[in-house]
Amino acid sequence: MEWDSESDGAGSIGAGEEEEEEEEEEEGGFGGGGGGGGGGGGMFSFAIEGMLRASGPCGLVVTDALEPDCPIIYVNCGFEEATGYRAEEVLGRNCRFLQCRGPFAQRRHPLVDAMVVSEIRKCIDNGTEFRGDLLNFRKDGSPLMNKLHLTPIYGDDETITHYMGIQFFTNANVDLGPLPGSLTKEPVRSTRFTPDNFFRPISTGPGQSNFCREYSSLFQLTDEVLCQSILSRLSPRDIASVSSVCRRLYLLTRNEDLWRMVCQNAWGSETTRALETVPAAKRLGWGRLARELTTLEAVAWRKLTVGGAVEPSRCNFSACAVGNRVVLFGGEGVNMQPMNDTFVLDLNASNPEWRHVNVSSAPPGRWGHTLSCLNGSLLVVFGGCGRQGLLNDVFTLDLDAKQPTWREIPGVAPPVPRSWHSSCTLDGTKLVVSGGCADSGVLLSDTYLLDVTMDKPVWREVPASWTPPSRLGHSMSVYGGRKILMFGGLAKSGPLRLRSSDVFTMDLSEEEPCWRCLTGSGMPGAGNPAGAGPPPRLDHVAVSLPGGRVLIFGGSVAGLHSASQLYLLDPTEEKPTWRILNVPGRPPRFAWGHSTCVVGGTKAIVLGGQTGEEWMLTEIHELSLASSTV
């Protein structure tokens, strides 16, 4: 199952570094391998001939090089006979466990030659064959000498997709003494399952309490309990791994209802509801949708032409998505004329076209504002630059109302008027506003929150002992429920204003929220994470993906009008790493944050091509995140 094409774990199949965590038992490298070096030794067919001539048991193991840590996907009967491990006990694990003495050992045995293990790692890193001998252990703890021939297998695109290991096992003349806590020969007595003994070892005899994998209490649970109480709490990646453990779990993980629960628990109800509104996503199915949105294997650009018109022509408008519709409000017309009209583009239509929305009580015209969508079809506009200067007013519009009407929200204690700020929404009811440009060009660094569903909404400034440098043109994204991520913008740096690539996060669920510098180029001691980060920019596009990841592209980059390269960051990682995402198709020449929105959780819509000062809003680019939406 191709679940992590970006993982760097493929190189660890044979290495087996000692770690402090208990998971090390599960991390075994190619159990064999020996002191002979690797490299381009003879043809693999010689090993096949040797296997046929061998008088002793010969193991055959195949691992998936595209999965993290190269899990085993096949072992033959010879492997089972020689090692004492059954196939269902080792599938999904890395072969490194053979370097540990017994099924409960957590570290590589000290007699295993570390130089040989290092040589195996080097061969895997270089994509070359390996031949050699290495000490391994049977399940009962007795030593084996493994003469291993390891070879990479290439796919059609010259990428290593699998590793195949042929193992000739012989008894090793090593006196290790008895295995500590070894199992008795007495048959295992069945234990009736109760909630109290679920996490306890199953007794194997009087005075014994060794866990017996053959009679795991987990499998005494019903399918319903396994799905609803255990599997549904795992991440999509974990479900994909669990499905390879045994036939029963494989069949359970084929269930679409289970996948929906997994997606909802991992991504949140709001994201799941948005995905349910996309017809193409429904046809794809939750299992495949989870895979494609996790691996981004199907991401692609395409260009569309739509009908209708947005007139008069304008720039510096704001756009957002309501279901599968794109809504455009306001903008800057000829001679800096502020606009206050509303247009809708329905992407569900067979022939999408821009349509002017007849609304009542339109807000004052503006540009440099933000437009966001709350629960359902409720739009909210904040701030911007109007005919009389900067604004700090709030208006809402129910797009699905019989007679759509803009309604002003008279919030108490509003923030100072501003433009080119950034905003995002929380819980479908709250508007978060950050930074921007105030009167006389002063940059701001404050953060405010407003619950627009309250009878008497009150603006609340989020207190923080330290704030990032003041800025405009940055992006704000929500992940992990109530965490927000700030990226880029034009930031104050002493007397200067410089484009930024800094990343800051804040958890609004904390009793005393505070800003934390995740990474960046301009913060003392911050440094950049591993990988090539995006160049500093402002007015870029930030696409929030299910699971908390953020895609960055476009905007104003030093020396360029826009940058089409996509960058991916997962702020939930222990050490967040920027990754470059290469996407097929033709990207837009220009992409700006104020004119791009995410539709249905499966695609980002970039509005308009720009020719000089003219915006062509009948030309749009679509970044599809799932294959069936193209």
From Swiss-Prot:
Residue stretches in coiled coil: none
Pfam families: F-box-like, Kelch_2, Kelch_KLHDC2_KLHL20_DRC7, PAS_9
Residues recorded with modification S-4a-FMN cysteine: 95
Keyword Nucleus: yes
F-box domain ranges (all copies): 216-262
Domain PAS: 48-127
CDD domains reported for this sequence: F-box_AtADO-like, PAS
Composition bias, Acidic residues: 16-28
GO CC term, one of those recorded: cytosol
Chain segments carrying region Disordered: 1-36
Taxonomic superkingdom: Eukaryota
Pathway named in the protein's UniProt entry: Protein modification; protein ubiquitination
Family per similarity comment: Belongs to the ADAGIO family.
Function per UniProt: Component of an E3 ubiquitin ligase complex that plays a central role in blue light-dependent circadian cycles. Acts as a blue light photoreceptor, due to the presence of FMN, that mediates light-regulated protein degradation of critical clock components by targeting them to the proteasome complex.
UniProt name for this protein: Adagio-like protein 1
Organism in which the protein naturally occurs: Oryza sativa subsp. japonica
